[in-house]
Amino acid sequence: MILSALALSVSLLWTDIGSKQALICEVSSLQPCLHHLPSSVRHQLPANVSELNQILGQRGAMVMAVEDSTIAGLILLSPENLPGSLSVNLSGSIVSLNLENQHELTLWHEMGHLEANRLQDSGLIDELTPYMHEWLADCYLAWRVAQEKRSLGPIWQQYNRRNIDVMQSVDTMSHWTVPILSQLLSRYSLQELIAFETFSELMSDLLPQLELPAPDSLAEFSSLIHRTFSTEVLQPLPNYMSWRKPALRSYLEPTLTKLLGEEAAEHWLIEQKMLTGNDVFPMKMSHQVEL
């Protein structure tokens, strides 16, 4: 099902998840929206609207999977909690990234969680960890963007958003899907992504080739990111986690270039001991502005 701009403006919508459907409800009309669920599904969800709102909190969206022959789950959207921009402090300067199409991208990410369950049900994935859920959901977002937007721009926006989130706080490391998105973006052109008729076809091709970060690696990246972007006064340790700096540099370069421009991004990386004067600054960002 292709969701039009008009459809996205309403507070209730059914969307396809394979052979099943998911109900999309906005929090502003949650109670009447939930009435569209059969009792067998409703009983799998929190008992009342206030409890659902409490679980959602300040998030812009949330998905709840259910066990049913025709319904895959419930997606809650809170448009007023979706950010229009993100800002981060880089060496004393506040820089910002405007976020576009957040309603669609957020919805596609939440749908991606249900699609991840489908991959497991089909046997394509044996086990789903919480981190796998997040990067699979972002891979679905990327595939959906290619199919409907015919552009890599919104995928790069999601990539940059994930980086800025961890720059702001490593509490969001569970959603840092950049190590996977970077592989997807380097492996496939826009036309190649479009050529995959289904998400499962894309993942059947991508999964055997993915290099998945181990939990220990993610913990080390988290520590290095915290030290690099913390606004606290910390003891200078220029060689801290030096073995992780080349990979982190490659993950951050596109976002830093988007925020600062190429020359300033290169200067910042040198300042942070992630780039030396003899290193080549390889990441050109023309593909980020592709619309």
Language model segments and positions:
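Active-site scaffold of zinc-dependent metalloenzymes
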Residues: 55-100, 117
